[in-house]
Amino acid sequence: IMGFTKPIEHFILQRKKVITMNTLYVGIDVSSKSNVVYLMLPNGDKHSNFSVANSHEGSTQLVKRILSALTSHSLDTVLIGLEATSVYGDNLVYFLREDATLAPFNRKIHVLNPKQVKKFHDAYNDLPKNDYVDSFVIADCLRFGRINKEVYLGDYRYKALQNLTRARFFAVQNLIKEKQRFMNVLFKKYSTMTQEKVFSDTFSTTALAVYDEFDSAEALANMDLHELTDFIIEKGKNRFPDPDAVAKAIQKAARSSYRLPKTVNDSVNQVLSISITSMKALESQIKEFDKAIKAQMELLPNVLISIPGIGPVYSAGIMAEIGDINRFDNQAALAKYAGLAWKQHQSGSFEAEVTRLIPSGNRFLKYYLYEAAFSLVRCDKEYSDFYHLKYKEVNRCQHKRALALTARKFVRLVFRLLKDNRLYVPAK
């Protein structure tokens, strides 16, 4: 193979051969411009390796080479594997699934976790690292069959839903980061207001109006109290039970805040104004994603929406990442796929009491499971009791631990409802 310092046969002879008859293994190392391919015969021997462009024309050449190998060796099954490398492999997978010339053969496509492929690669101590070697390792992973593999979602409705739920995930993360940056800048203008809970919602319409429409902490502190109260009533649409008390709390915080030089204060005001505009735009994006997700969910059966507190958005985020529930043998396999499994730390007679979550897993699925579980805590007594029980068991990382364990419990419910295709019935 190009890039090997030793013949590939050297490495093949160093490992135990696992023979699966009548199967061609295709390892593909995907990049933005090219796809490096390794074709492996059932006994582990090399058939060929080559590179094609990551384009429609290049994929057509790839299929022709696969067909030639299948027919020349009288094989009836082809297993194709590639790593999950951002968006670069999606179009190739669509092409391979839709290509009619491969239809007569038993065709399966697997998108592999790059971390697991790397660990498989590390088992070969003297293998170099390049694209041609990577394609060989991927093909060998498929042949051994002892690596957790993700079969590509065959139902395009799930892929369409996944595009929306993942885009929403990134919009939410951007909003969180923008709010964090906003609070850092707000401290410069109203230092005490960020330290004390003046508003129940730091990012409410009234709060943002106070941050944005007053030039400085000094101007706010010197404003007539009645005028400030009227301002609070107007911006809060007369929903504050005691607007006069709110106005007094705001002025008290403004008086004890630092005073900035005018030049610095002006730049801070500009940053806050732009940040508020960005947050409103992101919130608008999230609402549009929610509408699109709800419309897409009408095309899919959804038993998860029967769970209290789990609306169409959270259920969509979960279902989009799971796809066909039959991909998972049991609820433990689903939990591990979501990264909700704990590492065992044991040696001799020692058994660690504190263990960590595994670092791998589908971060999108984990996010939506966490969000759904926390919503369920607020709406379902059984899950609320479980969360608070786990919360009280420890003195540190209470919420984080309790939420992870609640999400793990929720996985069992999700698996059973999807597996049996039945609605949720609360415990009596």
Model-predicted segments: where are they?
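A detector of single, family-specific signature residues
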Residues: 1-428
